[in-house]
């Protein structure tokens, strides 16, 4: 029987980000998903080019009953932090209209 420090259910954007964060902290991670391939929805977003973030992310663009939650969440992990992560992994991307960020290569 294997031992895992962290078990994550779901290989979508949040599950993969959570697994990467745990891995950076030297945790052994198991990600379980019902789909045969991880990140299925991410890979098809943006016509297969993966619209992975937006540089114009601001609290005023969100409709929410608790606007303080949005401010808090966005301040804890701003767009440029994810862009830094993408760049560290050598992924080429471009900025399109309205600040949308897309990978340059089609997802496989």
Predicted features and spans:
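N-terminal Rossmann-like FAD-binding beta1-loop-alpha1 element of flavoenzymes
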Residues: 4-31
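Conserved active-site and cofactor/substrate-binding residues in soluble primary-metabolism enzymes
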Residues: 17, 37, 77, 81
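Gly/Ser/Thr-rich helix-start
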Residues: 11-16, 47-49, 91, 100
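Conserved N-terminal glycine-rich FAD pyrophosphate-binding loop of Rossmann-like flavoproteins
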Residues: 21, 35-68
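Feature captures the FAD/FMN-dependent oxidoreductase FAD-binding
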Residues: 76-108
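Glycine-rich phosphate/pyrophosphate-binding loop regions near the starts of catalytic domains
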Residues: 62-64, 73-78
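Short, contiguous strand/loop micro-motifs
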Residues: 5-6, 68-72
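Short glycine- and Lys/Arg-enriched binding-loop motifs that mark or flank ligand-binding interfaces
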Residues: 6-11, 42-44, 95
């Amino acid at each position: 029987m294997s031992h895992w420090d962290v078990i994550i259910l779901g290989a979508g954007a949040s599950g993969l980000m959570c697994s990467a964060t745990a891995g950076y902290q030297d945790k052994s991670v198991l990600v379980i998903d019902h789909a045969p391939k991880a990140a299925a929805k991410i890979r098809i977003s943006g016509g297969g080019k993966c619209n992975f973030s937006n540089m114009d992310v601001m609290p005023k663009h969100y409709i929410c009953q608790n606007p303080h939650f949005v401010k808090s969440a966005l301040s804890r992990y701003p767009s440029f932090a994810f862009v830094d992560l993408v760049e560290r992994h050598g992924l080429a991307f471009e900025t399109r209209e309205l600040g949308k960020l897309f990978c340059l290569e089609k997802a496989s």
